[in-house]
Amino acid sequence: MRHRKSGRQLNRNSSHRQAMFRNMASSLVSHEIIKTTLPKAKELRRVVEPLITLAKEDSVANRRLAFARTRNIETVAKLFNELGPRFAQRAGGYTRILKCGFRAGDNAPMAYIELVDRPETAAAVEE
């Protein structure tokens, strides 16, 4: 029975799910906005928010914990050098999920997940 088991299975085994969320977390940290299905975005939020909270206090131990969860040095560097200081005064709620319709092939609900306080892109600044 699955009583009180949190998290979505997403029709994947545990290692596939873990690898997928590692990759998606790295993509979200590097690009600061990604488009994915709504259930994946909601689960990704549970992975990324604790990483940013960890990055608010820069220490070797916290960097090692973040690396153990992401397995990506560039992601860890951006977390601790940019995102940690940016969200230092914010007590949680670092991500925003915006619904964006349905996918053409299978009608799956799609969503953008982005980091709040994301700097505007260069194209938007020029306009």
From Swiss-Prot:
Q: Which cysteine pairs are covalently linked by disulfides here?
A: none
Biological process, per Gene Ontology: translation
Q: Which UniProt keywords apply?
A: Ribonucleoprotein, Ribosomal protein
What GO terms fall under cellular component here? cytosolic large ribosomal subunit
The record ties this protein, via SUPFAM superfamilies, to: Prokaryotic ribosomal protein L17
A Pfam cross-reference name: Ribosomal_L17
On subunit structure and binding partners, the annotation says:
Part of the 50S ribosomal subunit. Contacts protein L32.
Family (UniProt) = Belongs to the bacterial ribosomal protein bL17 family.
NCBIfam families, alphabetically? L17
Q: What name has this protein been given in UniProt? A: Large ribosomal subunit protein bL17
Q: Which gene encodes it?
A: rplQ
